[in-house]
From Swiss-Prot:
The chain crosses the membrane at residues 27-47, 53-73, 76-96, 118-138, 149-169. It is a multi-pass membrane protein. Plays a role in cell envelope biogenesis, maintenance of cell envelope integrity and membrane homeostasis. The keyword Cell inner membrane applies. Belongs to the YciB family. Keywords: Cell inner membrane, Cell membrane, Membrane, Transmembrane, Transmembrane helix. One of its GO terms (cellular component) is plasma membrane. PANTHER family: INNER MEMBRANE-SPANNING PROTEIN YCIB (PTHR36917:SF1), INTRACELLULAR SEPTATION PROTEIN A-RELATED (PTHR36917). It holds the Pfam family IspA. This is Inner membrane-spanning protein YciB. It comes from Haemophilus influenzae (strain 86-028NP). The keyword Cell inner membrane applies.
């Protein structure tokens, strides 16, 4: 249910854009995102930091989009958020010597430090690619093409990145069913 809630604002944005236009879609996106946060808080008692950041960005850029009736503000959101995620992952790894992916998944997975570093860099690269593809599409293709990319392309890219991460992690999982503490093969 929690994962489904993440997609509802995006689906409603896409449908409203196709039926109404930019302003209407932005308003629906903002309202649906606020409702999503309220439901998460009510049902689960907590809203994760990443969800708060994303919701704040959606509300801010969505309201700008609705007010000016100009989609470029939502296009900026995608670029800025992906860029920030990449920067945070890279700064955590190189400045603080802590792969952030390990902080997020370290309780569930036991992997060698090299694997955590590779995963962290892989996801930073993914966010950079998403940012660059978003810039390219928003500047060189139609508004409708960008909405399609935002609604489906980024999801597809995320699924592919998740599968690649899963395949990479799998090679470090214990093969005999034991719980190896160091995650070595």
């Amino acid at each position: 249910m929690k994962q489904l809630l993440d997609f509802i604002p995006l689906i409603l944005f896409f449908i409203t854009y196709k039926l109404g236009g930019v302003r209407e879609a932005a308003i629906v996106l903002v309202v649906a995102t606020i409702l999503q946060i309220v439901i998460l808080k009510w049902k689960y008692g907590i809203v994760e930091k990443q969800q708060k950041i994303m919701a704040s960005a959606v509300v801010f850029f969505g309201l700008l989009t609705a007010y000016f009736n100009e989609i470029r503000y939502l296009q900026w959101k995608v670029t800025i958020i992906n860029g920030l995620f990449a920067i945070v992952l890279l700064v955590a790894q190189f400045q603080f010597k802590t792969p952030l992916i390990k902080k997020l998944l370290g309780k569930e997975l036991q992997l060698p430090e090299k694997a955590w570093n590779t995963l962290n860099l892989g996801w930073a690269l993914f966010f950079i690619i998403c940012m660059l593809v978003n810039i390219y599409i928003s500047h060189n293709m139609s508004e409708e093409a960008w909405v399609d990319f935002k609604s489906f392309g980024i999801i597809g890219m995320t699924v592919i990145a998740t599968i690649i991460s899963g395949v990479y992690i799998y090679r470090y999982l214990p093969k005999d069913g034991s719980n190896s503490k160091d995650g070595e093969k």
